[in-house]
Amino acid sequence: MAQSSKYQRKPRSGERKRSQRRLELTEEQKKQFDDLLVRTGLTFENRKLLIQAFTHSSYVNEQRIFSSSDNERLEFLGDAVLELAVSQYLFKTYKNMSEGDMTKLRASIVCEPSLARFAEELQFGKLVLLGKGEEVTGGRTRPALLADVFEAFIGALYMDQGLEPVFMFLARFMYPKIKEGAFTYKMDFKSQLQEFVQRDNRGQIRYLIVQERGPAHDREFVSDVQLNEETIGTGTGRSKKEAEQLAAKQALLALNQKES
């Protein structure tokens, strides 16, 4: 039976005011979001999702907007989407990598410091809508906040357009850094170079110590790495292993630049 209107709870004045409040951007903020889309080459059918990805809970609380307007739910979704996208990339790219190594490498890619760096490179910090308290305590540059925003952005992109645009975005801004060896959780550069060469049947890799210099207590080694007898990288280190690793790193950078 329907409850009599006489006994229905009337909304408090604060609740009514809160429900009517809408998030509105300044012209400068709108321009910053437009600039972001230009830089990333993306479009959003639903711009509200894009803005929500950058809306911190402190801003929602201060502005008395519905709590569902902050980016926490999108962050939750983006975390899962990012794990899937990175997992698929590693699975397809490193065909000889063990499950354990893929797990470690993925963890180094989707961890807070890594995601915060991506957010910084994309200048996400200046777009975040923050409460005054969070602003004065340095929230705009806090790694944890930036990492959350990056995940929320991925979640928003997925909700707006699906997985394929997410893959394309990551292929432009994240995957190249994986190939360059930016995430070396400790899959070493020699292993990465070996994977790279084997993947396309490019030939044989060989390491040569071409020089040793300095006194015994402060020895320095120089290593060349060759692909089919052609030197593709050189490294210098305090041990032969370190020199070979740095040679492999240089070779990876050179090969990736040649392909791009």
UniProtKB/Swiss-Prot annotation:
Compositionally biased region (Basic and acidic residues): 12-24
One cellular-component annotation, GO: cytoplasm
Gene3D superfamilies (UniProt xref): 3.30.160.20, Ribonuclease III domain
EC annotation from Swiss-Prot or TrEMBL: 3.1.26.3
Domain spans labelled DRBM: 188-257
Main subcellular location: cytoplasm
GO function terms (MF aspect): double-stranded RNA binding; metal ion binding; ribonuclease III activity; rRNA binding
Protein keywords: Cytoplasm, Endonuclease, Hydrolase, Magnesium, Metal-binding, mRNA processing, Nuclease, RNA-binding, rRNA processing, rRNA-binding, tRNA processing
Ranges of residues in domain RNase III: 33-162
EC category: hydrolase
KW Oxidoreductase (keyword) present: no
Catalytic reaction annotation: Endonucleolytic cleavage to 5'-phosphomonoester
Region described as Disordered: 1-24
Cofactor: Mg(2+)
Catalytic center residues: D79, E151
Subcellular localization, as worded in the UniProt entry: Cytoplasm
Matching CDD domains: DSRM_RNAse_III_family (cd10845), RIBOc (cd00593)
Domain of life of the native organism: Bacteria
Binding-site positions, Mg(2+): E75, D148, E151
Pfam families given in the database record: dsrm, Ribonucleas_3_3
Record's function text: Digests double-stranded RNA. Involved in the processing of primary rRNA transcript to yield the immediate precursors to the large and small rRNAs (23S and 16S). Processes some mRNAs, and tRNAs when they are encoded in the rRNA operon. Processes pre-crRNA and tracrRNA of type II CRISPR loci if present in the organism.
Subunit structure: Homodimer.
Family: Belongs to the ribonuclease III family.
Protein name: Ribonuclease 3
Organism: Shouchella clausii (strain KSM-K16) (Alkalihalobacillus clausii)
